[in-house]
């Protein structure tokens, strides 16, 4: 992860279009969306014109647009640790992408310590139900850095950030339980991970709409590998970009040659990237369509 961009820190007030201080509810639901390897120049609200992001652009127009909301580091784990703890990169306990890669059953990164004060713990202490969905990367399943031990009532997604770069993985995690994805073996593309994560996120919001909640949505999109379902989103971009096909490098495949270890070949990298950004935009609008009341 070279760059991170926060798409929106959305609250009930923002989603409902409230602009007057007196009209805002006392306790706001908070939805924090984090994208991976998305530059500010990839969004329409910052002047980009080739990739469609109408829903994110609308959130920016009706809310607040930041120009100095920086990633904490140049790679995933320490950057996420800085965000989760509020600490400068020089003080946060995670200094690099150390840990497993998913090979040979080893999964997950070096854990943040048990006594770390995280956003999840802060919101839980304030009476919020908390959930995180997508990419974690701050401690392997069952370790002290496991999200369910770091203030989150519910987690669904990739525990290991190395595996999070596969959009058709063999499994995801629900809390500390591994959920196998039938039909996926890294070479076959049956269940697109982020569509599943999106549905679980919406389910969390619906189940908790009568309570105040904090949802941290850490998407991998549009980080490589550049891979999306064959649907109307990618079809809309075909033929619009000059392409330079990406070929998987020698050694990027498992010894038996059955699946790519790193990134798969992609004949349409620019088309695929654009479709990934627009897919993220589609996900974002889902939250604005939900009614999210809080108790008085």
Predicted regions and their residues:
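Catalytic-site neighborhoods of secreted/periplasmic enzymes
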Residues: 82-187
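C-terminal motif of bacterial Sec signal peptides marking the signal peptidase cleavage site
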Residues: 16-17
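A short, hydrophobic C-terminal helix/tail in secreted or cell-surface proteins
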Residues: 291-296
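A short, Lys/Arg-enriched amphipathic alpha-helix followed by its capping loop at the start of a domain
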Residues: 54-62, 119-122, 126
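Hydrophobic beta-strand core positions in alpha/beta domains
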Residues: 32-34, 132
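Sec-dependent signal peptide recognition
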Residues: 2-8
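Active-site-proximal cap/lid insertion segments
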Residues: 24-28, 35-51, 58, 67, ...
């Amino acid at each position: 992860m070279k760059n991170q961009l926060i798409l929106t820190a959305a609250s009930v007030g923002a989603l409902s279009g409230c602009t007057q201080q007196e009209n805002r509810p006392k306790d706001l639901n908070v939805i924090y969306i984090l994208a991976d390897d998305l530059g500010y120049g990839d969004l329409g609200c910052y002047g980009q014109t080739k990739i469609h992001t109408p829903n994110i652009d609308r959130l920016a127009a009706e809310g607040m647009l930041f120009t100095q909301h920086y990633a904490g580091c140049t790679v995933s784990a320490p950057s996420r640790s800085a965000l989760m703890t509020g600490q400068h990169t020089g003080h946060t306990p995670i200094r690099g992408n150390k840990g497993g890669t998913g090979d040979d059953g080893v999964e997950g990164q070096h854990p943040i310590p048990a006594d770390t004060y995280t956003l999840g713990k802060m919101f839980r202490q304030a009476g919020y139900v908390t959930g995180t969905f997508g990419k974690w990367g701050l401690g392997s399943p069952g370790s002290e850095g496991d999200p369910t031990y770091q203030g989150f009532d519910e987690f669904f997604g990739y525990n290991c950030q190395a595996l999070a770069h596969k959009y058709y993985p063999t499994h995801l995690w629900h809390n500390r339980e591994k959920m196998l994805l039938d039909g996926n073996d890294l070479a076959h593309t049956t269940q697109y991970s982020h569509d599943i994560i999106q549905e679980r996120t919406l389910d969390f919001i619906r189940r908790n709409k009568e309570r105040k909640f904090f949802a941290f949505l850490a998407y991998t999109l549009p980080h490589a590998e550049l891979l999306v379902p064959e649907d109307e989103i990618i079809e809309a971009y075909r033929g619009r970009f000059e392409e330079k096909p990406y070929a998987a490098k020698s050694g990027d495949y498992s010894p038996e040659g059955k699946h790519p270890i790193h990134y798969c070949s992609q004949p349409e990298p620019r088309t695929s990237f654009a479709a990934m950004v627009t897919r993220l935009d589609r996900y974002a609008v889902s939250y604005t369509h939900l009614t999210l009341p809080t108790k008085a």
